[in-house]
Curated annotation (Swiss-Prot):
It comes from Stenotrophomonas maltophilia (strain K279a). This protein binds to 23S rRNA in the presence of protein L20. GO terms for molecular function: rRNA binding; structural constituent of ribosome. Pfam families: Ribosomal_L21p. InterPro entries: bL21-like (IPR028909), bL21-like_sf (IPR036164), Ribosomal_bL21 (IPR001787), Ribosomal_bL21_CS (IPR018258). Belongs to the bacterial ribosomal protein bL21 family. PANTHER family: 50S RIBOSOMAL PROTEIN L21 (PTHR21349), LARGE RIBOSOMAL SUBUNIT PROTEIN BL21M (PTHR21349:SF0). The keyword RNA-binding applies. The keyword Membrane does not apply. GO terms for biological process: translation. GO terms for cellular component: cytoplasm; ribonucleoprotein complex; ribosome. This is Large ribosomal subunit protein bL21.
Length: 102
């Protein structure tokens, strides 16, 4: 069974036992979280579609909180000896899907 859930403005296709990195959530490491905004459920019987399916939920365990690798940004103007360097590290929450109900 798999599901498509929405969190942090992004959609993720998940199955039980998968590990993934999502946008940072303010939760404790080791705690259980529940996602209610499910767009699609699929299994061998077929597919259920809808905007926020009623009764569908995905539960996950929080494995860690961290920061991704640095993304480097360079802006420059040709022939003008002007260059601006910048870097950014995005915060993330790593989760493991423990159950899909629906």
């Amino acid at each position: 069974m798999y599901a498509v859930l929405v969190t942090g403005g992004k959609q993720y296709r998940v199955a039980q036992g998968e590990k993934l990195r999502i946008e940072k959530l303010e939760v404790e490491v080791g705690s259980e979280i529940k996602f209610d905004n499910i767009l699609m459920l699929g299994d061998s019987d077929g597919v259920k579609l809808g905007d926020a399916l009623k009764g569908a939920a995905v539960t996950a365990k929080v494995l860690s909180q961290g920061r991704a690798d640095k993304v480097r940004i360079i802006k420059f103007r040709r022939r003008k000896h002007h260059m601006k360097r910048q870097g950014h590290r995005q915060y993330y929450t790593e989760i493991e899907i423990t159950g899909i109900a629906g």
